[in-house]
Amino acid sequence: MASPLNRPGLRAAAASAALTLVALSANVPAAQAIPPPSVDPAMVPADARPGPDQPMRRSNSCSTPITVRNPDVAQLAPGFNLVNISKAWQYSTGNGVPVAVIDTGVSPNPRLPVVPGGDYIMGEDGLSDCDAHGTVVSSIIAAAPLGILPMPRAMPATAAFPPPAGPPPVTAAPAPPVEVPPPMPPPPPVTITQTVAPPPPPPEDAGAMAPSNGPPDPQTEDEPAVPPPPPGAPDGVVGVAPHATIISIRQSSRAFEPVNPSSAGPNSDEKVKAGTLDSVARAVVHAANMGAKVINISVTACLPAAAPGDQRVLGAALWYAATVKDAVIVAAAGNDGEAGCGNNPMYDPLDPSDPRDWHQVTVVSSPSWFSDYVLSVGAVDAYGAALDKSMSGPWVGVAAPGTHIMGLSPQGGGPVNAYPPSRPGEKNMPFWGTSFSAAYVSGVAALVRAKFPELTAYQVINRIVQSAHNPPAGVDNKLGYGLVDPVAALTFNIPSGDRMAPGAQSRVITPAAPPPPPDHRARNIAIGFVGAVATGVLAMAIGARLRRAR
């Protein structure tokens, strides 16, 4: 990524948290000197009709999110105010920008126009969210305000991009379910059957993914549930880009599993759920081919750096979407405490030649580590301070609000901000995590794309990065180049910069040149010489015979 602007006053007020390496098992993985990953364009997956690669079944009840006291859903979300979205609307509202949300599906809502993009879980249309995650992510990106703020006028007045391929946006709320299912456990973090351990080869089902909302924190105080606002009452759920169009692609879910699931251990939570790195790759290609100009991926797979598995198909898909189809790809950095995820070192003062500390990476976050094509997003709190549990790594590009989150319910359509307890003695779990930080940045990307449609995907990322509020060191592995500033991204005089990431081309694997045709010149000369000699000898013999005959 390009270096950030050196502007006084744009340093974040937050200082980076002290590094504590967290492992999910007793074995702490050794650091690995890994470079940014290369990609092989020959591995781009075909864009077939979305569907599962094996029979799937429903294994859990759908999640029913609730409303807790804090944050107050009757007020604007603190993150909305922190990054000053309402002022950014003076310059852009993301009018007509197609934003693909590769997640757990999006339930239609009158405040959230959404286009069906397909379903890699059950082969449906993607307009169903059993995990109450994709709908919340989409709410942060593009929900229309209700009551507290008026709907802004579309900016720019004319959409800069054609509508996405497929049916027109769905704006009607779905029919209410006949029976409300009991609450399911809150969507656990990413489901990688490989634990953080020294380098055994990845298991066959490594790379399974799930929503990257934060895991429960037993040290937090319990937030009591409160009644939601009555239907139609003003609420604080407001999207960053309310005139963008969501393309919903259901790729992952904790409520579904293969008909013949494998298990990584006796704990049922370790069973492989729906969603893998390969299905993310296919979803990325499909989203790009539908015309998405921003692709939000709020799911994360964490693998040990010593054995990151075969990610060639995913890398090729990201390359294709970003460079061939010109889509801005935004991904959650991941949360320390999710399955397989842990903080990487921040900086090695003994190796200033590697300022992002790639050589000490212990855990890879995918797709974030494909930083030539992906803008990875870390999380800050409501005051702009770095979240200690936001996963650090050299791929983190920027940060955005990741706490005090609210969104629209996939069931009733009203405001929600937490998951209920799943077992006796557990607490309500307010929404938090880098999933929602990525959604903020996807909304900002939609604002920038609408205002500057001539910029390439990488130039849009460059503008977001260069206008961010830098951390004290200018850049670090927790916040990247700092907290996003939508107003600055839309108004600062920032050179467009390179059309592609400068280092990207050097990491593209090109097919080997075909071998040169065989050189038969020596053989041909020899054959010609032998033929000439033979012809001469034959001519002399015939001439001698003719003379004797006379």
Swiss-Prot record:
SUPFAM superfamilies: Subtilisin-like. The keyword Lipid metabolism does not apply. GO terms for cellular component: plasma membrane. It is found in: Cell membrane. The keyword Ion transport does not apply. This is Mycosin-2. Belongs to the peptidase S8 family. Residues 79-490 form the Peptidase S8 domain. The chain crosses the membrane at residues 524-544. Induction: Constitutively expressed during growth in culture. It comes from Mycobacterium tuberculosis (strain ATCC 25618 / H37Rv).
